[in-house]
Amino acid sequence: MGQKIHPIGFRLGVQRIWTAKWYGSNRNFSDTLLEDIKVRDYLKKKLSHASVSKVLIERPAKNARITIFSGRPGVVIGKKGEDIEVLRGELARLMSVPVHVNIEEVRKPETDAQIVADGIAQQLEKRVMFRRAMKRAMQNAMRLGAQGIKIMSSGRLNGAEIARTEWYREGRVPLHTLRAEIDYGFAEAKTTYGIIGIKVWVYKGDALTRGEQPAAAEQEKRGKKSGVKHAAAS
């Protein structure tokens, strides 16, 4: 089950939060949801080179607050904040309410699944070999603290006549474990041969409950205890 289901949807309410926070009545729920989809599509096209990880949409009392998580916040803000003002105006027109835009920096974009997937897609569109792009992304993620990463590419890889799927994994990626912090990203590369889909899973460690110790510390503690017993016996 963990292999097939969407890793973020699987963990919603357990250790992940929703990326849309608002309440809609039965009468206007569908219109508000459609607005959200249009806003996300617009931001995806507009900020395609700004390494956007996710977009959080909140709707407090007749206005909207949009938080953009980006690996390159300077690209979003623009020179002297000009670009963000234009962006705010466009979003206000789309949503028909006053919009406040916040920019949050992603500290380690190399370990963010969505940014990694977008980066690989951009490389494939520039005719970089898919294996090289995947392996380079995996090395960067592991070097910067990811405990495991899995990347899957599907489509006419290297222009092959028959579409196929190839994937690589480094480290652990426990998709069944609910407490495991799994980040997931998906992107499409529009190549001359057709569309290639890229999926990325990044394992960042376990979400610990209060008073619980990480697995490594627990093993070390057990080792010390067994060492004391051994010394006492000798």
Curated annotation (Swiss-Prot):
Residues 39-107 form the KH type-2 domain. One of its GO terms (cellular component) is cytosolic small ribosomal subunit. GO terms for biological process: translation. Residues 212-234 are annotated as: Disordered. InterPro entries: KH_dom (IPR004087), KH_dom-like_a/b (IPR015946), KH_dom_type_2 (IPR004044), KH_sf_prok-type (IPR009019), Ribosomal_S3_C_sf (IPR036419), Ribosomal_uS3_bac-typ (IPR005704), Ribosomal_uS3_C (IPR001351), Ribosomal_uS3_CS (IPR018280). Keywords: Ribonucleoprotein, Ribosomal protein, RNA-binding, rRNA-binding. Gene3D superfamilies: 3.30.300.20, Ribosomal protein S3, C-terminal domain (3.30.1140.32). SUPFAM superfamilies: Prokaryotic type KH domain (KH-domain type II) (SSF54814), Ribosomal protein S3 C-terminal domain (SSF54821). One of its GO terms (molecular function) is structural constituent of ribosome. Transmembrane segments: none annotated. Part of the 30S ribosomal subunit. Forms a tight complex with proteins S10 and S14. Binds the lower part of the 30S subunit head. Binds mRNA in the 70S ribosome, positioning it for translation. PANTHER family: 30S/40S RIBOSOMAL PROTEIN S3, SMALL RIBOSOMAL SUBUNIT PROTEIN US3C. Belongs to the universal ribosomal protein uS3 family. This is Small ribosomal subunit protein uS3. It comes from Thiobacillus denitrificans (strain ATCC 25259 / T1). The lineage of its organism: Bacteria, Pseudomonadati, Pseudomonadota, Betaproteobacteria, Nitrosomonadales.
